[in-house]
């Protein structure tokens, strides 16, 4: 089964926030993405609300509930109390926990599962009691012991950080080496009973190789590259192009 595509709305929100105006519309373009066959919408609401605002969350939840009940809402963030309260209020289908400092421009590394094992175990337990699927942001390094610790937290999935892979857009040999490593990491995780998502700097050009090395990839979450393409091709056609890159017929 092809990997599902979740469209990250943060870049759209960041463009909107350049002016005190309601456009481009986060929910409007989210609707277009879902109409074009995206499987879900992703947001990462940071404490300073520099892109997604807390006030965006309920309209996105309502859009999915009212118009696209088969789609999923994925909320990403560092698991402090403020983020967890947002999650519990807006009830996404999936919660992706990332080890971000609030000042970071973007997510750029996975969890240290040895150092953060107790924190993650407590947070995952809290979220699982509420019925959320939980994914943990993970580096693409085939470390069986670390992935075993991730599994022990009770998480359902990992999301492989693909930034280094995406950064090899002009070095195909290095991209191949990293894709092999990501594939090995995914294989270990799947063997432990974790499903595997992926995200960061994924494009129409580099998705096919990633999917080749991770044939059981469950989901990709894509924002920057997809939004950049949408400026050229339009949101609907861009979503279809990314779906085809994931192996779907679109």
Curated annotation (Swiss-Prot):
Gene3D superfamilies: Aldolase class I. The active site is at residues 44, 76, 200. It is found in: Cytoplasm. Pathway: Cofactor biosynthesis; pyridoxine 5'-phosphate biosynthesis; pyridoxine 5'-phosphate from D-erythrose 4-phosphate: step 5/5. Its EC number is 2.6.99.2. It catalyses: 3-amino-2-oxopropyl phosphate + 1-deoxy-D-xylulose 5-phosphate = pyridoxine 5'-phosphate + phosphate + 2 H2O + H(+). Transmembrane segments: none annotated. GO terms for biological process: pyridoxine biosynthetic process. The keyword RNA-binding does not apply. Keywords: Cytoplasm, Pyridoxine biosynthesis, Transferase. The keyword Transferase applies. It is an enzyme of class 2 (transferase). 1-deoxy-D-xylulose 5-phosphate binds at residues 46, 51, 106. The record marks 159 as: Transition state stabilizer. 3-amino-2-oxopropyl phosphate binds at residues 8, 19, 201, 223-224. InterPro entries: Aldolase_TIM, PyrdxlP_synth_PdxJ, Pyridoxine-5'_phos_synth. GO terms for cellular component: cytosol. SUPFAM superfamilies: Pyridoxine 5'-phosphate synthase. CDD domains: PNPsynthase. GO terms for molecular function: pyridoxine 5'-phosphate synthase activity. Catalyzes the complicated ring closure reaction between the two acyclic compounds 1-deoxy-D-xylulose-5-phosphate (DXP) and 3-amino-2-oxopropyl phosphate (1-amino-acetone-3-phosphate or AAP) to form pyridoxine 5'-phosphate (PNP) and inorganic phosphate. Belongs to the PNP synthase family. Homooctamer; tetramer of dimers. NCBIfam families: PRK05265.1-4. This is Pyridoxine 5'-phosphate synthase. It comes from Rhizobium meliloti (strain 1021) (Ensifer meliloti). The gene is pdxJ.
């Amino acid at each position: 089964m092809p990997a599902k595509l979740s469209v990250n709305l943060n870049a759209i929100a960041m463009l909107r926030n350049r002016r005190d105006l309601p456009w481009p519309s986060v929910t409007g373009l989210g609707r277009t993405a879902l109409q074009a066959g995206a499987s879900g919408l992703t947001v990462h609401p940071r404490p300073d609300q520099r892109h997604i605002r807390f006030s965006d969350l309920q309209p996105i939840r309502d859009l999915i509930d009212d118009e696209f009940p088969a789609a999923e809402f994925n909320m990403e963030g560092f698991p402090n109390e403020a983020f967890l309260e947002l999650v519990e209020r807006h009830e996404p289908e999936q919660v992706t926990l990332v080890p971000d400092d609030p000042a970071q421009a973007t997510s750029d590394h996975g969890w240290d599962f040895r150092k953060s094992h107790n924190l993650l175990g407590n947070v995952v337990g809290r979220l699982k009691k509420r019925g959320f699927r939980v994914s943990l942001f993970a580096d693409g390094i085939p470390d069986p012991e670390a992935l075993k610790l991730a599994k022990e937290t009770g998480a359902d999935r990992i999301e492989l950080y693909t930034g280094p892979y995406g950064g090899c857009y002009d070095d195909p040999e290095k991209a191949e080496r990293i894709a092999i490593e990501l594939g090995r990491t995914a294989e270990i995780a799947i063997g432990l009973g974790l499903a595997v998502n992926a995200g960061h700097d994924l494009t129409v050009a580099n998705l096919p190789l990633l999917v080749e090395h991770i044939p059981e990839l469950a989901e990709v979450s894509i924002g920057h590259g997809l939004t950049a393409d949408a400026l050229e091709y339009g949101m609907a056609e861009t979503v279809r192009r990314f779906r085809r890159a994931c192996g779907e017929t679109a």
